[in-house]
Amino acid sequence: MFDIGFWELVVIGIVALVVLGPERLPVAIRTASHWIRLIRSTANSVKSELEQELRLQELHNDLKKAEQLQMSNLSPELQESIEQLKAAAQSVTRPYEQQNTIHPAPAAAEVKAEPAQPAAAMTHDEAPMVTTVQSTDVLADKKEEVKP
C-alpha cells in the first residue's frame, strides 16, 4: 500500500520504541491499529453502498430503455388503446381531485339569517319559561337513564 519494505518497518519500530518507551508503545500500537481498522471498514462500507446504488441506477436506466423500445415498437392500434387507458385513468382521478379541493364559502346574500330579538325586548315571563322547559326535559331524560 505505502510501498514500505521490511527494514523500513524495523526502523520505524525502533524510533517509536525510543520516542514512546516500552510502556506506552503497546497502547499506541493498539490505538493506531483500531483507527486503521475503523477507517478501512468505513471506506469499505461506503464503497459497497456506492456500488449497490450504481447497480440500481444502471438497472433502472436499462429498464427505462427497454420500456421505451417496447412502446415505440407497438402497433398503432395498441398505442391508441394505451392512450385511451391513460385518458380513462385521468378521468377517474379527476373527481377525487375535485373532491379534495377547497371550494369558496357561499355568498352572504344566499344565507339569510332571521334577525334575533334582543334580550331586552323579551318580557320577563318568556325567558324563564324557555329555560324551565329545557331543564325539565334534560332532567326527565336523566331520570329515565338511571332507572333499570
From Swiss-Prot:
Pfam families assigned: TatA_B_E
Q: Which GO terms describe its molecular function?
A: protein transmembrane transporter activity
Indicate whether Transmembrane helix appears among the record's keywords: yes
HAMAP family per the record? TatB (MF_00237)
Quote the cellular component terms of the Gene Ontology held in the record.
Answer: TAT protein transport complex
- What quaternary structure, including any partners, is listed in this protein's UniProt entry? The Tat system comprises two distinct complexes: a TatABC complex, containing multiple copies of TatA, TatB and TatC subunits, and a separate TatA complex, containing only TatA subunits. Substrates initially bind to the TatABC complex, which probably triggers association of the separate TatA complex to form the active translocon.
Which organism does this record belong to? Aeromonas salmonicida (strain A449)
The disulfide bridges present are none
Transmembrane among keywords: yes
Q: Which InterPro entries match?
A: TatA/B/E, TatB
Q: Name one GO biological process term.
A: protein transport by the Tat complex
Q: What family does the entry list?
A: Belongs to the TatB family.
Function statement: Part of the twin-arginine translocation (Tat) system that transports large folded proteins containing a characteristic twin-arginine motif in their signal peptide across membranes. Together with TatC, TatB is part of a receptor directly interacting with Tat signal peptides. TatB may form an oligomeric binding site that transiently accommodates folded Tat precursor proteins before their translocation.
**Cellular location(s):** Cell inner membrane
**Record protein name field:** Sec-independent protein translocase protein TatB
Q: Where are the transmembrane segments?
A: 1-21
Q: Top-down, what is the taxonomic lineage of the species of origin?
A: Bacteria, Pseudomonadati, Pseudomonadota, Gammaproteobacteria, Aeromonadales
Tell me which UniProt keywords the record has, alphabetically.
Cell inner membrane, Cell membrane, Membrane, Protein transport, Translocation, Transmembrane, Transmembrane helix, Transport
Query: What is its membrane topology?
Result: Single-pass membrane protein
